[in-house]
């Protein structure tokens, strides 16, 4: 049987992965933009069918041979490793995100390019783990603990859970939240200092200065073909929000349009998370296939009305 070896690329992490080209398996890819070139190469070498997770939904878990993602360090990095599905990240992202504990080298590899995928011979069998020896010299009554011991063990377990929760929280803040905040701040600073922000602001001012313009902006952001690519990390919404806020401060945009502008630039929020969320909920294949386009269309249909409602409410706030 053909084996496919996948190694990490430049600056990548994890691996190498060795996949058996078992007939009937499928390649699911959840990536923004065009179909990655490594998907075509994997399909050519394995003979597996490639499934677009955004358009066609996720196949049954037993049918997934490998998952290809383009996550920069959020939840998507760990969703498939948590289910022990071989995962290829086209970005050079290591153990990161809320599910970082499930990202291990034997199931995850990142920074992969076409040249990192090769065909090898039969895989070397892994040595079987040695079974655990159990001590059966004691009776069951001798092995049971008393009430005081059980209370102590329960308290110790509770303290351990709370301590681990605090440690995971701090770890997530340091490794995920703070770096992302620094990235967005640096990006906004570069845009503002380079003069690109003024160019974008002048282009947005006609739209953001009138309710109908905000409705048009919401329709653009929530358009089903664009919203999955505008949503990741809410970076675009944050940048546009800063630029619009500056224009409001300068008096170029009326203050009472701040609330509808907030709804307009966030009309695409979470559209990129739909396949991941359905996977977390272990939804059926038919549910994913129908649910993804349904939510995208619903966001498109509800984006403009929410802007109008916000504009109506803002009339009572700013008087």
Swiss-Prot record:
GO terms for biological process: phosphoenolpyruvate-dependent sugar phosphotransferase system; sorbitol transmembrane transport. Residues 198-199, 250-256, 318-319 are periplasmic. It is a multi-pass membrane protein. InterPro entries: PTS_EIIBC_GUT_C (IPR011638), PTS_EIIBC_GUT_N (IPR011618), PTS_sorb_EIIBC (IPR004702). Pfam families: EIIBC-GUT_C (PF07663), EIIBC-GUT_N (PF03612). One of its GO terms (molecular function) is kinase activity. The chain crosses the membrane at residues 177-197, 200-220, 229-249, 257-277, 297-317. GO terms for cellular component: plasma membrane; transmembrane transporter complex. Residues 1-176, 221-228, 278-296 are cytoplasmic. The keyword Ribosomal protein does not apply. Induction: Regulated by an unusual system which consists of the activator GutM and the repressor GutR in addition to the cAMP-CRP complex. It catalyses: D-sorbitol(out) + N(pros)-phospho-L-histidyl-[protein] = D-sorbitol 6-phosphate(in) + L-histidyl-[protein]. The active site is at residue 71. Residues 1-178 form the PTS EIIB type-5 domain. Its EC number is 2.7.1.198. Keywords: Cell inner membrane, Cell membrane, Kinase, Membrane, Phosphoprotein, Phosphotransferase system, Sugar transport, Transferase, Transmembrane, Transmembrane helix, Transport. The phosphoenolpyruvate-dependent sugar phosphotransferase system (sugar PTS), a major carbohydrate active transport system, catalyzes the phosphorylation of incoming sugar substrates concomitantly with their translocation across the cell membrane. The enzyme II complex composed of SrlA, SrlB and SrlE is involved in glucitol/sorbitol transport. It can also use D-mannitol. NCBIfam families: EIIBC-GUT. The EIIB domain is phosphorylated by phospho-EIIA on a cysteinyl or histidyl residue, depending on the transported sugar. Then, it transfers the phosphoryl group to the sugar substrate concomitantly with the sugar uptake processed by the EIIC domain. This is PTS system glucitol/sorbitol-specific EIIB component. It comes from Escherichia coli (strain K12). The lineage of its organism: Bacteria, Pseudomonadati, Pseudomonadota, Gammaproteobacteria, Enterobacterales. The gene is srlE.
